[in-house]
A protein has these predicted regions:
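N-terminal interaction modules that seed assembly of large macromolecular complexes
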Residues: 2-60
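Internal, Lys/Arg-enriched amphipathic helical interaction segments that engage polyanionic partners
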Residues: 58, 65-166
Length: 166
């Protein structure tokens, strides 16, 4: 079963059984982190360039626990005429991490489109001024995906134990 399907099923099954604030993480992972989530993150991580792939209308949200596993390692660069990645040395592009705010379903789609999902290089963000892109190895997406799967299993184990006691 795909992690996105599992997240959706868990959300549907637990919506009336546990407090809504405990389900926010599931929703963020399923649909992606919102603009107001990203603003809260930038308050905690000044200087990190954020990849804003999904933005929606602001709503009241629970305080954000910074999901460190969603920071992807990479490099700012350009692909040269021979197809090689060339690093860009611009002071404002010194970050080597960006926050991946897209939902798990989008991550699944990205990985499905890659011929070799553990060896590919992909671009996450673009800087218009320099023409540079932020490149990551696809293994970074796999790492996020696996972490969410593991965290979901831990969450389910905990909730099942709590519901048995109640």
């Amino acid at each position: 079963m795909k992690v996105s399907d599992a997240l959706l099923l868990v959300l549907r099954c637990l919506r009336q059984r546990i407090p809504e604030d405990r389900l926010i993480w599931l929703n963020r992972e399923l649909l992606g982190y919102r603009q107001d989530d990203l603003e809260a993150l930038s308050d905690h991580h000044m200087g990190l360039n954020m990849f804003l792939a999904w933005i929606s209308e602001p709503r009241r949200r629970a305080p954000l626990e910074v999901p460190g596993y969603r920071f992807l390692e990479g490099v700012w660069g350009r692909i040269d005429r021979s197809g090689r990645l060339v690093s860009v040395m611009e002071p404002e592009l010194a970050q080597r991490q960006i926050f991946c705010n897209i939902g798990i379903q989008q991550i699944e789609l990205q990985l499905d489109e890659m011929e070799h999902p553990t060896e590919a290089l992909f671009s996450l963000s673009f800087d218009e001024r320099t023409g540079a892109e932020f490149f990551c190895e696809s293994a970074e997406l796999v790492r996020v995906y696996d972490h969410v799967r593991s965290k979901l299993i831990d969450f389910l184990d905990k909730v099942i134990a709590e519901l048995r006691v109640a």
